[in-house]
Amino acid sequence: LKFDIFGFSRGAAAARHFVNEVLRVDGGVMSGHLHHALPAFVSEFEWSSHTSINFVGLFDTVAAIADPAQAHLSVGDAKNPGVNLSLAQGCANKVVHLTAADEHRHNFSLNRVNSEYHEELVLPGVHSNLGGGYPSVSRERVLLGRPKLVRGNYYSLTGLDSARLQASNGWQQREAAEAAFRAKGLPGNGRFIKQELKLQPNNHRATGQGSEGDVLLMLSMDRLMRGELSRVSLRIMHAKALESGAPFDILNEHDSRFSIPTDLQPIASKVITAAMAGKSAVLSNSEKRYLHGRYIHASANWNAQWGFFPNKPRADNQRAIYDDQ
């Protein structure tokens, strides 16, 4: 009995846990479902001697497990109770882990494999640019940098009031954030939207220039995005699995589900060629800007959901990465 095992995100974490169940001498949870008493198995079938793992294909492992019963509420730290992510040397004939170079959400920390024993490659894109899930075309409307609260400005936002607001640290931070996003290639063919939200002042005392109040500064982005970048990682994983003898058909180049858009093909070819040589592609700044403007989604953002920010970026926009354990 030979296994080829695949998974994306928490599914990749589940795949890694499953590998460890298969490798247990007694078959772990599998022994109660696959055993010699079943019609498909010969009577001499023994789990430990008649099972093996051929290929393990992982897309950007994000275990992200909390345990509220133990007061462990964070899904972004290294603790993942109840799941065995460790992939030992020799656990399979081949382990390939494709990771997202541009993911940096607080709740989407990366759980690496041991690259001394297994193949781990970094590909351009965020989490679902590798594992899939984005439509071919979608509209992306996101609140980018964290909203800046400027206290004690003036309610009218005109004349001297506006000049004071523009001289504030919050305003300058928003300008710097916009410049950094533009340097990455955003907003592509879309647009940035700057908003100044006047908050109702707590104190209505009169001044010579109007009522004092706080202002919330926001930077949003509205654009159309393409979803076909995930087909690059699909092709790489498919080719790696075929090399290891996984029973897959050859991809049909004319099948619209797998085809790569013409404009993406030069970068895709570069990434795929490097990956098949066991290397992570090094892209030029112009190539990165093109991808960020058209294909790499802004997964890290400050859009609120039910009063929470599930997709907020990690500090300094750097992803937390945890070694195999």
In which residue ranges do the predicted regions lie?
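Active-site- or binding-pocket-proximal scaffold segments within functional domains
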Residues: 1-325
